[in-house]
Amino acid sequence: MTPSTQIPNRFKLLCVLVLLICGCTASRDVPIRNAIWITRWDYLSEVDVVKCIENVAAAGFDTVLFQVRGNGTVFYRSEIEPWAEEFQHADPGFDPLEVACREATSRGIALHAWINAVPGWRGATAPPDTVPPQHWNARPGWFLHDAQLKRQPLQPNYYVALNPCLPQVREHIAAICSEIVEKYPVAGIHLDYIRFLESGIETDYPRDPESLKLFSEQTHQSDPDAAPEAWERWRRDQITALVREIRQAVRRSDRDALLTAAVYRTPLIAHDRVRQDWPRWLRLGLIDAVFPMQYDREIPRFEKRVRECLREARGYPVLMGIGTYLHDDPAVTLRQRQLALRLGCQGVSHFAYSSFWQAGHAGASGADLRLLRRQRILPVNRPHR
């Protein structure tokens, strides 16, 4: 190579690298303005699923976040994880995700499959034998363990977590997302609980030998207690690695599918408490949009936290999560929606479906408030349709 050709060729290589980097991190169009979460407790039958999608479409929502994984069990026909306990771990005779996709497509709204990422089981008792076997029974080493090698204990009404520091756990969660986008015409995958869980923070999980070996190899630090900053950073990086592996798996299966995440209400709490560095995920192009869970009754605090989220998002798409279920006065919900949009959020998402309509597991109580919310809140959706 002569000096005269060396510079142009190097310049060409530099241009290619810049284009590749920009292509990985550029913000994609996220066509979401009015979204709503439908939880796994909002439906029990095929009729329930049809009614859910029918209601949200008629109300003017353009996007539904439809929960299909709760805690190592699922609400679709999977070859990887067993049916959910809500269906007695057996095929209920219909596929909720298939029905939801069909109904959403016919009504012109986008459906994102919502999964709880790290929860591995929920409740005070172990799961029964299932096919495929549930992780708690089949893969005890996948769960968080303390320094005495005791697995995170089961507890009433909350989750025990899979260990996101283990490569095999990250691979499994990514495979679930890949299975969904390969089998179903979803518009995207919506991640929840993509973090260390609040319960167990004081135990400083994980302390199992495999996790500590990985920490030592990757940081050249042998003792987390002697290097607390490196320990925190490494665990945060493992959550980011999980998001990256999910992104790669989804892209391999369906390049058009969006990847979004329900994230902690402020970046600082997310970063420091549950090791969820979601502003970094946005900047790296690992996710397409965030839904900060800004569930609050207080308007001033809501506004302050929305501003914090937007500042750290740096122009990337933010859909503000509104805790509609907390508001006995629909005026609070409307005010929060108005504030979020005025401050610069691309849109909002309501938590949750059962705030507006009687849902599968809910009783009839609260019918008057649900009706009032439908009358007062939902009409503002329609101009955007």
Question: Would you name each region that the model predicts?
Answer:
Residues 61-94:
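Aromatic-lined carbohydrate-binding/catalytic grooves of carbohydrate-active enzymes
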Residues 210-329:
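Glycoside hydrolase catalytic-domain groove-lining segments
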